[in-house]
Amino acid sequence: DIGISQRGAVNIKLIDAPGCYSLAASSMEEEVARDQICDPQADGVIVVCDGTCLERNLILVLQILKHRNDVVICINLMDQVRKRGLAIDTKKLSQILGVQVVSTESSEKKLIKKNLSDAVIKLTEREGTYERTSGYDPDLLKDPDEIAAQAQEIAAGVVIRDNEKEDTSIKI
């Protein structure tokens, strides 16, 4: 656990699963993380993705979305993304994945906590029903190459280089 807090009437328990890049666990730590992520008793999952290597993180996101859709994606290190001359279209990413996407800066710890709290509120306020499996189902991850290709395609569609941004200047 990295923290328990309260936001209004909502009790929030955050569990950190660092270094988890796939639900196909290869260590005991990854198995524990996977089981917590896929636990149908959990009210939702916030996946914190490193914006500087979005494609790798999208593999885990896509695997999780095969198991449940009560997910919020938090793209972290957006300041580092900008330093590299890149941008991430979080609105487009949200549309593609069908879940909320928020972003945070690596240098602003208070803002990170606030954005994570906002992500939890978005989970609790979402209308409609959530779909969840009854736990981890390895059959949903039979084709890792397909998931990796999908992650690559999504990343290519939402990561924008500075020189690819739309030029809205008026030419005289």
Please place each PLM-identified region on the residue numbering:
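Conserved RecA-like P-loop NTPase ATPase core
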Residues: 16, 33, 172
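Extended, hydrophilic extramembrane loops/domains of integral membrane proteins
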Residues: 118-125, 140-160
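Short hinge/gating elements
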Residues: 18, 135-139
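Switch II (G3) loop of P-loop NTPases
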Residues: 11-28, 51
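Canonical P-loop GTPase G-domain recognition
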Residues: 79-132
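Conserved C-terminal guanine-recognition region of P-loop GTPase G domains, centered on the G4
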Residues: 3-9, 31-102
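Helical mechanochemical/support elements of P-loop NTPase systems and associated helical scaffolds
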Residues: 13, 25, 29-32, 56-60, ...
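Short, membrane-interfacial amphipathic segments enriched in basic
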Residues: 156-170
